[in-house]
Amino acid sequence: MIAHLTGLVGQMESDRCVVDVGGVGYLVHASTRTLSALPRPPDVTRVLVETVVREDAFLLYGFAEAAERDWFRLLTTVQGVGAKVALAILSALSPGDLAGVIAAADKASLTRVSGVGARLAERILTELRDKAGRMPAGPGVTIAAPPASGGVEADALLALAGLGFRRAEAQPVVGRILARLDGKADLDVVIRESLRELAR
């Protein structure tokens, strides 16, 4: 199994990037938090990797810090939490915030995450309640997305800045997208749509 990759940062999207190691490009899925922490292409980076082998695919999930990787592993032990949902949770909540949410049984914070309904949030809280206290909090900076559109806008701009876009060029695009979606889109949707427009 692959434990980490060290190489050149290549193409970046809202939920993945390419890491070029010795001329081989590895497609690495990651949270917006990890993508924001990576240097701009084509700088060198090192990402921790969790390898997931499925019947039809061999997938790599990358993390800027060990705490996020460990939480990814723990989250995916919960029935109904696949890799995509785990990354969505880790995009919205830092490891420290997630530990706090579980300790406080804060279901509302979990249900704000795309793909997490009330029933799944309850299952996460129940199954991880006794394990969360032993998990690393990590040094990550909180960029959780609150339900108000102002918070989504600020977090989207932070993520886009981490992907190399200047605030001056990203802010009008994010504003238009939020207006078009009536301010109700979640963070992942706003980042994805913004990248689509900025790439034109």
UniProtKB/Swiss-Prot annotation:
Region (Domain I): 1-64
Biological source species: Gluconacetobacter diazotrophicus (strain ATCC 49037 / DSM 5601 / CCUG 37298 / CIP 103539 / LMG 7603 / PAl5)
Region described as Flexible linker: spans on this chain: 144-147
Keyword ATP-binding: no
Protein name per its UniProtKB record: Holliday junction branch migration complex subunit RuvA
Region spans: Domain III: 148-200
NCBIfam families noted in UniProt: ruvA (TIGR00084)
Family in the record: Belongs to the RuvA family.
Domain notes: Has three domains with a flexible linker between the domains II and III and assumes an 'L' shape. Domain III is highly mobile and contacts RuvB.
GO biological process: DNA recombination; DNA repair
Gene coding for it: ruvA
GO cellular component: cytoplasm; Holliday junction helicase complex; Holliday junction resolvase complex
